[in-house]
Amino acid sequence: MKSIEDFMKKYELSFDGVTLIAGVSGGPDSMALLHALHHTVPASATLIAAHVDHMFRGEESERDMRFVQDYCEAEGIQCEAVQIDVLAFAAENNLNKQAAARECRYAFFQELMKRHRAEYLVLGHHGDDQVETMLMKMAKGTVGIGLAGIQPKRRFDSGWLLRPFLKLSKDDLLAYCKENRIPFRTDPSNSEDDYTRNRFRHHVLPFLKKESEDVHKRFQSVSEFLTEDELYLQALTKDKMNTVITSKSSSGVEISIERLLALPMPLQRRGVHLILNYLYENVPSAFSAHHIQVFLDWISQDGPSGSLDFPNGLKVAKSYHTCLFTFQRLQCENVSYHYEISGAGEEELILPGGSSLHVSGPGSTRKLQGNDVFATSPKQVQFPLYVRTRQNGDRVKLKGMNGSKKVKDIFIDEKVPLSKRDSWPIVTDAVGNIIWIPGLKKTIFEELDVTNNDRIVLQYRQHEKCRGLAKNETGY
């Protein structure tokens, strides 16, 4: 197949005497790949088909496995197949089905690479997959090289992962299968709209193809441009971060806040990426641009100290002019704060710990749902408002009860961890009345009249729950 030959020429690859693992599901994409490799690689190379039965569809998925095994036997291709109870793995590791399937699949590929000392893992992702992936990344707010989608060549284990079909469409591969009489299996779940990718595939991609039949080629060109730009910016960031990082070890990195904030914003964001990728071994999904900006806003604020929780036990501690990223347990620090909210217009207040309060200006008609949203007005309280940490003797007048209740007792009732109580935000009015404990309790000072033109709405966002940044930011 010319596509594979062009790919080898572009990336200066030689398959002489090497071992290649081809991921084969039994669908048209991977069967076209297996056929093309079988008729392209030299006789000195070893080609191994790798199939994973995720056990999602019982006997049907087992038939897919036998189909791949039978095809390989007929064509004289070595085949490695495995059955993995992915649903059980997902439950044990708190993953969704698709993420668990991918993790299990790539773990098997990695095992085969080691066992057979293979140089290359080759997969059948095509141009339509690339379009879907890039659109999904944009919709999620992915930053950096993740926006470039699927990489055609990247490091994998001790070798390389190759995707030679990214300039071909799904229709190209179906035509290749038809022309060469290549059998394949069809997964009925691909026709359902249960998964995000399928919704993009069924409803967005057809529209784009009507506008431009070669849209996959356009997206692949953009992906390559983005990758080249990002690699340059990453190299520049690495150079600049040498002056930002004051110390580092396997468990922690300390930086100068002043030096980080002195960098241009694109390098600040990538600097945070580099630190997280250095520290994490197996990282959750990538941060969005919003999450990165929240972190940078947090360290930009006045205040000598504070802490922020990242996924998988990573702590970030701000202390005067430095910031420490570490997996080690932090000593308790004074994280008290006291901020003013004028209520004159829309504003966002980033709090120590990474959470925030968003204020909608006077006249907001937003409906209130849950304890993360609260409305008030000059009719109910005296402005300005203040956001502070708890104080000894704090009491609050809750809706629907006589008298007042200790804030300490509310924290106990709501099972707020001891480590978070001293930094939990409390909103008061100008004379010290506690009017709201964000995320926990509302008070008698709430304004429910949406026609009140002086009404303002406050929304509490717990950004510390955001997920982490992956080492392979594309996820592919």
Swiss-Prot record:
Q: Which GO terms describe its biological process?
A: tRNA modification
Q: Which reaction does it catalyse?
A: cytidine(34) in tRNA(Ile2) + L-lysine + ATP = lysidine(34) in tRNA(Ile2) + AMP + diphosphate + H(+)
Q: Show the CDD domains listed in the entry.
A: TilS_N
Which UniProt keyword terms apply here? ATP-binding, Cytoplasm, Ligase, Nucleotide-binding, tRNA processing
Q: Which GO terms describe its molecular function?
A: ATP binding; tRNA(Ile)-lysidine synthase activity
Name residues in a coiled coil.
Answer: none
Localisation per UniProt entry? Cytoplasm
Protein family (similarity comment): Belongs to the tRNA(Ile)-lysidine synthase family.
Q: What is this protein called?
A: tRNA(Ile)-lysidine synthase
Q: Which gene encodes it?
A: tilS
